[in-house]
């Protein structure tokens, strides 16, 4: 989400945006990466969420081919640059007009103009293990639901302190569209609230 803002800024300056793609990470980093507004505002470092969950900072290392950081314990790291002004169609190999399924499970329209990354280096551990999340699926939507739950909890607690006891962003709603709330009814007017 944030990378698009940085990519546009670099492109406006006519420069490529150096990036690292880190794969095979510990679960805390995947959880932290799911956080978005309004739970974490723009500019918030989601690696801080991961560090808090694991009770130690996420170690970073300097990339070998780009001037950008990478996650030290990643199994596989792809380093490259998002090229300014270079685009491809998302369905360039299928010509179907459709993309991979969206997070709720339906097929969306293919993006006609995606940025291109020029890969500069790939580094990996010996016998690297790649565990990945490709949605839609329960693992993916459960992770997506964590920041949704936190946002709902924060908003309701601010509006009606002590009313919300628990919240679950159900996987049937992709972790975003269906919330189940447990509330503490304190007065007759709370019925049906």
Q: What are these language model-derived features?
A:
Residues 1-35:
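Internal alpha/beta scaffold segment
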Residues 25-193:
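Charged, compositionally biased interaction regions
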């Amino acid at each position: 989400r944030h990378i698009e803002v940085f990519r546009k800024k670099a492109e406006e300056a006519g420069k490529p945006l150096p990036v690292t793609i880190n794969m095979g990470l510990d679960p805390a980093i995947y959880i932290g990466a799911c956080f978005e507004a309004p739970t974490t505002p723009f500019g918030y470092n989601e690696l801080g969420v991961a560090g808090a969950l694991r009770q130690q900072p996420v170690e970073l290392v300097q990339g070998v081919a780009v001037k950008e950081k990478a996650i030290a314990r990643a199994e596989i790291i792809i380093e490259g640059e998002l090229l300014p002004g270079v685009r491809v169609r998302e369905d360039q190999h299928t010509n179907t007009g459709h993309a991979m399924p969206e997070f709720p499970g339906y097929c969306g329209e293919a993006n006609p103009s995606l940025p291109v990354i020029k890969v500069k280096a790939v580094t990996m551990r010996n016998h690297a293990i790649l565990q990945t999340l490709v949605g839609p699926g329960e693992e993916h939507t459960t992770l997506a639901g964590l920041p949704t739950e936190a946002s709902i909890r924060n908003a309701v607690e601010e509006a009606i302190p002590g009313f919300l006891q628990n919240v679950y962003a159900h996987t049937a709603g992709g972790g975003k569209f269906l919330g189940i709330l447990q509330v503490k009814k304190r007065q007759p007017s709370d019925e049906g609230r």
